[in-house]
Each structure stands twice: as structure tokens, then as C-alpha cells.
């Protein structure tokens, strides 16, 4: 980011940055802030080397692993790798062909869900999803027909999806259990 900022440094009184963030103070060059911003935006876009492909989000999976392989012990062992963050992301696993069979909205605002899924081998587990449940419902509607997303929370379903997930330990009323946290789906 810093390298590209140097290409338009004439627009700044000061600037700095690194791979994940940048900061700058815009120099006054024209009569109005709008003119300064527009000139800066124009030149920045002319120097931009991003392609459409660069704008496609990428998901990096650590291990394709069936949910039936996951254990509480594995989740506990993974916690030894903490602290997780930008330079040390929490491990991400994936499984294809899970069947979402039931969903339950949760939270005071009903904005996250607990989805029951069945593996190809017939094992059923629950996955918590803290992502946008409306987007997930829209995805199901596009893939399986209008109304599919809404039906997930009202009746039993059978929607094959592939997911990425993380493992954690859920502690509730003093009891610990393995928890699957769904991150991405397709």
C-alpha cells in the first residue's frame, strides 16, 4: 500500500501505511475539498494496477476435513496455537456435500443461526453461523428455489452445501462441548 501511495504523494502533506492499513493527510491544492479529492481519486485510479480478479474474495482452507473427524480434544489442541489474529489465523476446515436439514434463528435480534447438518455418512451435527443469515437464505433461494431460505427455519429440509468451518469449545452452564462455527458456504 505504501508503495502505491508514493506514486501520488504530491497529494499528501504526510502519509504512511503497511500491508493492512494506510493513513494520509490530503494537501490543499485546489479551491475546494471536493476538487482536491476528485483530482486525487482520478490520479489514484489511473495508477491502480488492481484487476477484477484481485477483487474476488479468496478463502484459504487449512485442511479439507470431514466434520466427523473433529473432536473436542482436537479443538482443545488447536487452542494451544492462540493467540489468533491477522498473522496467525484460526484454522479453517472444509467439507463438501453437507446437507442442511434444519435451521434455528438465535439471538435477541434473531440475527444468527444454529443449523443442523447431515454428513454424507449420515452423522448429524449442529453448526453455529454468525454470518448474515439473510444472505444465506438468499443463497438457498438462488440455488434451490424461491422460499428455500425461509423454509430452513420452519420445517425440515435437505439442501446440499459445501462449507468452511472452525472448531471451538462452547462452555454453557459449566459444561463444555465441541462447537462447529460455519464461516463460508457454496
Predicted regions: what they are:
Residues 1-15, 19-186:
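Acidic, two-metal ion nucleic-acid-processing modules in DNA metabolism proteins
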